[in-house]
Amino acid sequence: MRLTLQHINRLKVLLHLAGFLPLLWLILSVDQGWFSADPAKDIQHFTGRMALKLLLATLLVTPLARYGKQPLLIRCRRLLGLWCFFWATLHLVSYALLELGLDHLALLGKELISRPYLTLGIISWLILLALAVTSPQIMMRKLGSQWQKLHNFVYLVAILTPIHYLWSVKTLSPQPILYALAALILLLLRYKKFRQWWR
């Protein structure tokens, strides 16, 4: 069945809910004390995983549209990318406020430089910021051919963020490995595009 614009509009509503409802759950979890004895870490990990899930979902759109012969699915990619940036920003803010605290925010720059996994994280966030700012149609028209070159940096984010996650956990568990494998598979699906860049 070929998806229509009506289907896509309904899908967008569901995707907005998928991006927003976890925020309500996060707020409720904090209010009800559902987290562990270290809620600051739990919040950081939850927001980080949400950003990574949405990044992977964003990267999945193009293969689904291409191999499923559903070109209108591409219209969902920007929405997912913006939700990814939203959760990545919450992840950064949660680290700055809950790990360092308001009294030690001045140390943020030093922390980002001295800890390699944080360096990868902030590089990824800065790229996502650039992609979010330039995502509207008006920016696409202004940047012309440079727009696609800029937005290809999402693949760098797909490499850096799983490494950031793997590096940040003290005890290696299956979860970050699975995210890294998922990112690798999605990147391999675009190998033809990468080959064109390297020629």
Curated annotation (Swiss-Prot):
It is a multi-pass membrane protein. GO terms for cellular component: plasma membrane. One of its GO terms (biological process) is protein repair. The keyword Cell membrane applies. The chain crosses the membrane at residues 13-33, 79-99, 120-140, 147-167, 169-189. Binds 1 FMN per subunit. It comes from the Bacteria. Keywords: Cell inner membrane, Cell membrane, Electron transport, Flavoprotein, FMN, Heme, Iron, Membrane, Metal-binding, Transmembrane, Transmembrane helix, Transport. GO terms for molecular function: electron transfer activity; FMN binding; heme binding; metal ion binding; oxidoreductase activity, acting on diphenols and related substances as donors. Its main location: membrane. Its cofactor is FMN; heme b. It is found in: Cell inner membrane. It holds the Pfam family Ferric_reduct. The keyword Transmembrane helix applies. Part of the MsrPQ system that repairs oxidized periplasmic proteins containing methionine sulfoxide residues (Met-O), using respiratory chain electrons. Thus protects these proteins from oxidative-stress damage caused by reactive species of oxygen and chlorine generated by the host defense mechanisms. MsrPQ is essential for the maintenance of envelope integrity under bleach stress, rescuing a wide series of structurally unrelated periplasmic proteins from methionine oxidation. Belongs to the MsrQ family. Heterodimer of a catalytic subunit (MsrP) and a heme-binding subunit (MsrQ). PANTHER family: PROTEIN-METHIONINE-SULFOXIDE REDUCTASE HEME-BINDING SUBUNIT MSRQ. This is Protein-methionine-sulfoxide reductase heme-binding subunit MsrQ.
